Amino acid sequence: MNVYEKNTVEFVTVGVEFCAFVEKASEKSFDTFVPVLQKLLPFLYLKAAMVEKPMPLGEDELGTFVTEVDYETIRVAMSNILEEKDDFYNGEESTSISECVADVYQDIKDCISNYKTGQEDVMNDAIERCIDNFQTYWGT
């Protein structure tokens, strides 16, 4: 797979915008956060769905860039914005929008951070892992 293929580059571009937006959640109100998130998430989904999942190339472990502190900071910021609208029941258990979005953020941030290394085998494997997680978890 060419890591510079149009659909891949567009997915990474939208991923960068999504992460930048979510990282500034603590600066936003409900009325400025939710309408943008409602547009970004479907756009991110569409771009992820358009990427052809590559075969893994590298044998090295991919970098992890989102720490537990980062994750929790993002989750809490979104939970504070959403307040009582955060929790929902997914048919099996109670969960929250903020936790689901933080999960997606972690996956996308790790992917784009690995992609930014410029090492094509790392870039390829970062896309492969992210698209696999999209197909298995957050995109289903």
Give the predicted meaning of each segment.
Residues 7, 29, 33, 97, ...:
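Residue-level recognition of alpha-helical structural elements
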Residues 50-116:
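Long amphipathic alpha-helical segments
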Residues 2-66:
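N-terminal interaction modules that seed assembly of large macromolecular complexes
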